[in-house]
Amino acid sequence: MAVIPMVVEQSSKGERAYDIYSRLLKERIIFLNGGVEDEMAKLIIAQMLFLEAEDPEKDIYLYINSPGGVVTAGLAIYDTMNFIKPDVSTLCMGQACSMGAFLLSAGAKGKRFALPNSRVMIHQPLGGYRGQATDIQIHAQEILKLKEMLTRKMAEHCSQPFEKVAQDTERDNFMSAEEAKAYGLIDDVVTKR
């Protein structure tokens, strides 16, 4: 089990200890670190809704270091990013692959960033299913619908033609931070705050 550092904050009321993530949440920073899955999505969504309730006018900062993960969990985060009033600024630190790259590109226009040594990877959704032939066919049709929808949305976020994004996501497509900027996945590569 990972050790989560604690930070102590001094105020006129005395001292208060926070775990580091709670302290950063006070600064409106949310971490998407690791595989995108339902439990993580639930926490990120709750944090976004909390921060919106605290101040609907101030930006939220989503820091991403993710190999990707479950499409439906990622879409729940994506829909919440679009549902809430505050802009969500995204920052890739480390890697943003698959659903991580999709969420990175979905940040507010002009507020999508990557650190200089970050890696971004886009591809088509992955899936697998076992069972009766008819059920396999149903699941295959569903993943093709998801592929079309994700490609269309990424094309919108990147200001790229649908056909180009469809072609570029046929296989794993790795990019440096500068290449991700040129593609339109992010707006800038940042080295300092």
From Swiss-Prot:
It is an enzyme of class 3 (hydrolase). This is ATP-dependent Clp protease proteolytic subunit. Gene3D superfamilies: 2-enoyl-CoA Hydratase, Chain A, domain 1. Fourteen ClpP subunits assemble into 2 heptameric rings which stack back to back to give a disk-like structure with a central cavity, resembling the structure of eukaryotic proteasomes. PANTHER family: ATP-DEPENDENT CLP PROTEASE PROTEOLYTIC SUBUNIT. It is found in: Cytoplasm. Its EC number is 3.4.21.92. The keyword Methyltransferase does not apply. It comes from Glaesserella parasuis serovar 5 (strain SH0165). PROSITE patterns: CLP_PROTEASE_HIS (PS00382), CLP_PROTEASE_SER (PS00381). GO terms for biological process: protein quality control for misfolded or incompletely synthesized proteins. GO terms for cellular component: cytoplasm; endopeptidase Clp complex. It holds the Pfam family CLP_protease. GO terms for molecular function: ATP-dependent peptidase activity; ATPase binding; serine-type endopeptidase activity. InterPro entries: ClpP (IPR001907), ClpP/crotonase-like_dom_sf (IPR029045), ClpP/TepA (IPR023562), ClpP_His_AS (IPR033135), ClpP_Ser_AS (IPR018215).
